[in-house]
């Protein structure tokens, strides 16, 4: 928004008066953070954002008001949180994962929105391209080159012909990954076998439906699957189906290998975008995938 000279002088006078009356509150910045669900990858993003803010001198209780709410996997709750945060008028809202980002972007055209852990922000209709958006929306993508993922599958399970994937067909990120795998896998002599898990509680049954049909199960960062990863691991172990992931935390939880984003690093990059906004810089969009690869 452009401010004319007269308006600028008026606002400046008001700000000066507020600074004299309450110098601490006038300097305090406000950041509201929301995630669609709590699981290790998304929690790491949140913590990374805090790391970046602290490194830049912003600390909760001192010069920063920090809010965090999880939607607990519920899109309706995500929308409620988005409306609540917009009403609070923070300096920036950080939306972690596609459903939360979509909810926040739908709720405001004015408050700066920084998305994170979104695989394809264009397909999710958060931005029109990966160039500077020209809107109130920016962020950091966790998009990975799927050909590298396929190479990992071939390296770990050389004889694999059928690759299973459990995913939520209602999550835009996962739909994008499935479509790309359908194109890429045949070039390596493999095919994709899909199993839908619209809710986290559906992950185990979806995985069981793949028994006898696949040689390996690959997981992207589908939020339903990652939040219920242990149930997928149990099915994989019982059926002796190897699990290959696209986030490194899933290896700690039972996957045999992963080529993926370090989500703490992703959060730090996201936090640096927030810091730029707090300092009055222009919004921008970046693709962090190449900088945060971990095997």
Say what each PLM segment does.
Residues 2-11:
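Bacterial N-terminal signal peptides that target proteins for export
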Residues 66, 70-128, 219-237, 241:
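Beta-alpha junction/loop-to-helix N-cap segments that form part of ligand/metal-binding clefts
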Residues 49, 284-295:
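Single conserved hydrophobic/aromatic residue that forms the stacking wall/gate
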Residues 22-26:
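Sec/Tat signal peptide C-region and signal peptidase I cleavage site
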Residues 166, 172-248:
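Pocket-lining segment of extracytoplasmic ligand-binding domains
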Residues 11-19:
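Bacterial N-terminal signal peptides
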Residues 31-50, 56, 67-76, 170-172, ...:
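Extracytoplasmic "Venus flytrap"
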Residues 121-160, 261-281:
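Hydrophobic alpha-helical segments within soluble ligand-binding/sensing domains
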